[in-house]
């Protein structure tokens, strides 16, 4: 993982590998949709945890990646909110 990593609390939801490659942690349904629509690639090491990979070389890829990062962040917020209300 690079120093360009994004967290919500202690949960890492995205991190870069170089200037154009990013891994993003999605919910399982989000992961399935991103893979089915070909806006993300299978993560090499941790697909079972919801991770996908994106390569950013075009404006369209950048826009799709931004949407996935937003989904990942929103999932983190939702998980934290659910965890707090369960206490």
Regions found by a protein language model. Give the residues of each.
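Well-ordered alpha/beta subsegment
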Residues: 47-87
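Short, conserved beta-strand/beta-arch hydrophobic-aromatic motifs that form part
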Residues: 1-46
